[in-house]
Amino acid sequence: MASREEVLALQAEVAQREEELNSLKQKLASALLAEQEPQPERLVPVSPLPPKAALSRDEILRYSRQLVLPELGVHGQLRLGTACVLIVGCGGLGCPLAQYLAAAGVGRLGLVDYDVVEMSNLARQVLHGEALAGQAKAFSAAASLRRLNSAVECVPYTQALTPATALDLVRRYDVVADCSDNVPTRYLVNDACVLAGRPLVSASALRFEGQITVYHYDGGPCYRCIFPQPPPAETVTNCADGGVLGVVTGVLGCLQALEVLKIAAGLGPSYSGSLLLFDALRGHFRSIRLRSRRLDCAACGERPTVTDLLDYEAFCGSSATDKCRSLQLLSPEERVSVTDYKRLLDSGAFHLLLDVRPQVEVDICRLPHALHIPLKHLERRDAESLKLLKEAIWEEKQGTQEGAAVPIYVICKLGNDSQKAVKILQSLSAAQELDPLTVRDVVGGLMAWAAKIDGTFPQY
């Protein structure tokens, strides 16, 4: 059995090694940061890539396994070497897409992403690493791709794609890949591709499912042909809200890379006019035919009305971001900050905290004093859940003055579902299915609690 002195010595050595490791990590981050910023950001590449007459000896060796494919051959590889591909979004889809395009020898990759690397990205965004957390995704991706294939020109764009810049940028590239995660950007990229005459390889992934198609190519429909009007903003779920398995984005990103390579090499796409659906849980792929190009399409029809790029956030009624949306369903009087709720909790005042997140999120983390009833149970007026809520209210009421209402505070992850729950509880109280209630939601939810109240509380 080790003596106390040996334990202390080992603890001291571990602390010293951890300090050395942290120092090495800082040096690595500095080195990677220096590598990824060799040039200032340019709005557009300065010149087209020159044509290539032949492959070098090194290129023949590097691409030998795909060169011997009769469908590709030397001619196809030469076309790849002069192709310029614009990738909108360097996240779960854009990372594997860019990785395989660089490996295949595509001449230039434009990398558009205004966001920075976060730890929550690393489970699926495989070009980024821990050492570059907080750095621009476009620069991080460019640095990784240069290490993979130094012959590929990588052009990072760290500003968000906007109606003022999109068309000029798209015109400088041969093929565009939409790897975004929001509806306004999808319409923006589609309209820019139609106006510039560029094919658009589009994919999306959510939870265990994904889909891919090619728009505006070889007489096929554009995005507006299929979706003339955007969906209601409150019906749209992104990866931050609904979650996604990293492997699913990897599969769809690889399929995007395949379509881009076939277009760039002159082989033609598989999914122009069709949509490939992927169900990861069942392991199924299914292809469905899309409607043909609409002659009355606002973008690509015979008499288009979209002749310039417009305000897509206003058109869609939502922000051009993949971040979680912040709903505003309640008045300020019906909401409290996490700081005010913490003050109430510390005072010992009688109240009930209702957590309306799904069970899978409660399994990740929770406040121990909260009653858990998922929002879906409230939406369908689940009898058992309402009984549980009534019992909890009654128990809390025993400590108050007779007849006093027990205030209910509703919390969720971000403060969106909690507002919906407040509305439901108010309607139940108005319909006398519950006793008269004072209900408020906690602004920002548990993520605000983690950021402002308890730094040890898990964020997800």
Curated annotation (Swiss-Prot):
EC number: 2.7.7.80, 2.8.1.11
Note describing how the cofactor binds: Binds 1 zinc ion per subunit.
Enzyme class: transferase
GO annotation, cellular component aspect: cytoplasm; cytosol
Pfam families: Rhodanese, ThiF
Catalytic residue list: C239 (glycyl thioester intermediate), C412 (cysteine persulfide intermediate)
Principal location: cytoplasm
Keyword Calcium: no
Result when mutating D417T: Results in 90-fold increased activity
SMART domains noted in UniProt: RHOD
SS bond partners: C316-C324
GO molecular function: ATP binding; metal ion binding; molybdopterin-synthase adenylyltransferase activity; molybdopterin-synthase sulfurtransferase activity; nucleotidyltransferase activity; sulfurtransferase activity; thiosulfate-cyanide sulfurtransferase activity; URM1 activating enzyme activity
Biological role stated in the UniProt entry: Plays a central role in 2-thiolation of mcm(5)S(2)U at tRNA wobble positions of cytosolic tRNA(Lys), tRNA(Glu) and tRNA(Gln). Also essential during biosynthesis of the molybdenum cofactor. Acts by mediating the C-terminal thiocarboxylation of sulfur carriers URM1 and MOCS2A. Its N-terminus first activates URM1 and MOCS2A as acyl-adenylates (-COAMP), then the persulfide sulfur on the catalytic cysteine is transferred to URM1 and MOCS2A to form thiocarboxylation (-COSH) of their C-terminus.
Record NCBIfam families: PRK05690.1 (NF004281)
Protein name according to UniProt: Adenylyltransferase and sulfurtransferase MOCS3
Gene that this polypeptide is encoded by: MOCS3
